[in-house]
UniProtKB/Swiss-Prot annotation:
Belongs to the ChdC family. Type 1 subfamily. Fe-coproporphyrin III acts both as a substrate and a redox cofactor. Coiled coil: none annotated. Involved in coproporphyrin-dependent heme b biosynthesis. Catalyzes the decarboxylation of Fe-coproporphyrin III (coproheme) to heme b (protoheme IX), the last step of the pathway. The reaction occurs in a stepwise manner with a three-propionate intermediate. It comes from Listeria monocytogenes serotype 4b (strain CLIP80459). The active site is at Y147. Fe-coproporphyrin III binds at R133, Y147, P148, M149, S150, K151, H174, Q187, S225. GO terms for biological process: heme B biosynthetic process. This is Coproheme decarboxylase. One of its GO terms (molecular function) is metal ion binding. The keyword Nucleotide-binding does not apply. The gene is chdC. InterPro entries: CHDC, ChdC/CLD, Dimeric_a/b-barrel.
Length: 251
């Protein structure tokens, strides 16, 4: 049997995509709308406290197109903590008007294709560079791009039949492309084998949305992607600071 990849695992992630039920929202009187938005604001203030003490992260983006209107991206140190956030959000009155359209569960990971190279001989969980990757601070970038992906198991193009050494080299070559976008695109990789329908969830942040097109295009021509990758739907959006939520919901 081929050697299986080992991973270092950090925060658990939930991408929660919602569509606003505008027809139902319009039927509410302004007073009820304000009460619901205030309740949401208190919820987000509590989320900010968790962020400030280093026990998690979160951000909100407005999604373009008809796949969703919003994505709530939350990171926590356990599935229980993540589920608690999800359940509390669903109990908000405004959640009745935010219809689920898609979700993705993963855990921030760094594989031993790369982790040993980054950490050298030390305990990788004590390495500052590794920890920054596993427990990332979400950047307040203007745009987000999320997509799930898997590695192929198709005849001769079967990633899982390749020797470890070949997989390591392909991933390192693939990573060189990502590193060439340092300062332009920040990437968070969530492993989701056994958690969701694909094997990874990829989240990209940038102040220039065209950088998403450039990096994904360039990576498509790399062998690790061209031969061995399969992709799900892509979601793209704009940063939505919590203080601008009321403006979004104003009719």
């Amino acid at each position: 049997m081929n050697e299986a990849v080992k991973t270092l695992d950090g925060w658990f992630c939930l991408h929660d995509f919602r569509s606003i039920d505008w027809a139902a929202w319009r039927e509410l009187n302004p007073g009820n709308q304000e009460l619901m938005l205030n309740e949401l604001s208190h919820f987000l203030s509590d989320m900010e406290i968790t962020k400030n003490i280093g026990e998690g992260e979160h951000t909100i983006y407005s999604i373009l197109g008809q796949k969703a209107d919003l994505v709530f991206f939350t990171l926590r140190d356990s599935l229980e903590a993540l589920n608690e956030v999800e359940n509390r959000f669903n109990k908000l009155a405004i959640a009745d008007y935010l219809l689920p359209t898609y979700s993705y569960i993963s855990v921030v990971e760094l594989s031993n294709y790369l982790a040993s190279h980054m950490a050298g001989g030390e305990d990788p969980y004590q390495n500052k560079g590794v920890r920054a990757r596993l427990y990332p601070a979400l950047p307040p970038k203007k745009h987000i791009c999320f997509y799930p992906m898997s590695k192929k198991r198709d005849g001769a193009d079967n990633w899982y039949m390749l020797p470890m050494e070949e997989r390591q080299q392909l991933i390192r070559d693939h990573g060189l492309i990502g590193r060439s976008y340092a300062g332009k695109v920040q990437q968070i990789i969530g492993g989701s084998i056994g958690f969701d329908d694909y094997e990874w969830g990829v989240t990209l942040f940038s102040d220039d949305a065209l950088e998403f097109k450039r990096i994904v295009t360039e990576m498509r021509f790399d062998e690790a992607s061209a031969r061995y990758a399969e992709f799900g739907s892509f979601f793209i959006g704009n940063l939505l600071p919590s203080e601008q939520l009321s403006k979004l919901f104003t009719i």
